[in-house]
Design a protein with these regions (language model features):
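Poly-acidic low-complexity segments
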Residues: 1, 51, 62, 98-103
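Conserved, well-ordered alpha-helix/loop/beta-strand core segments that scaffold catalytic motifs
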Residues: 1-58
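Generic hydrophobic alpha-helical segments
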Residues: 4-7, 86, 90
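Residue-identity detector for glutamine
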Residues: 17, 32, 80, 114-117
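Catalytic His-Asp segment of secreted/periplasmic serine-dependent ester chemistry enzymes
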Residues: 35, 39-89
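Conserved catalytic region of serine esterases and O-acyltransferases that act on ester linkages
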Residues: 87-144
Length: 144
């Protein structure tokens, strides 16, 4: 709590913007209370808190495929959905422009192409782990 208060104070003192993000995670009641408390602190300080757990439908989440892997957090397939959602959210709410294909950003374009290839390989590995039930024993349940 003290670290968060210090960070919020630093941001305010230096007139800095920040977006606090909680990526989708499997949550028990105590964890949910903690994140709600953090969100309240962030909002009370005038900053935005994006809880992706509130956007399962918009993310297009498939709980059997996007969480199943090695724990109570998203796997590579779910992370790709989070990344796409977050990039759209930031572009829409913060006016950041898409620089793909523009001069001076060629290395970013190349990195993105490499990432897409690696994602396709990761999807195969994840699907295999799910099919073989070869992942952590953390229970994954759809929210009510």
């Amino acid at each position: 709590e003290e670290c968060l208060r210090n960070l919020l104070e630093y941001l305010k003192e230096n007139d800095l913007q920040a977006l606090f993000i909680l990526s989708p995670t499997v949550m028990e009641e105590e964890k949910q209370k903690m994140y709600n408390y953090i969100e309240d602190m962030v909002n009370a300080s005038g900053y935005e808190f994006l809880n992706m757990n509130d956007y399962y439908e918009e993310l297009g989440f498939d709980f059997a495929a996007d969480f199943s892997d090695y724990g109570g957090h998203v796997n590579g397939v779910g992370a790709q959905k989070c990344t796409a959602f977050l990039s759209s959210y930031i572009a829409k709410n913060y006016g950041l422009e898409d620089k793909r294909g523009e001069m001076g950003f060629e290395s970013w374009d190349a990195a993105y192409e490499q990432w897409k290839q690696e994602l396709e390989e990761a999807k195969k590995t994840i699907a295999k782990h799910i099919e073989e039930k070869d992942f952590a024993d953390a229970p994954v349940e759809e929210p009510e």
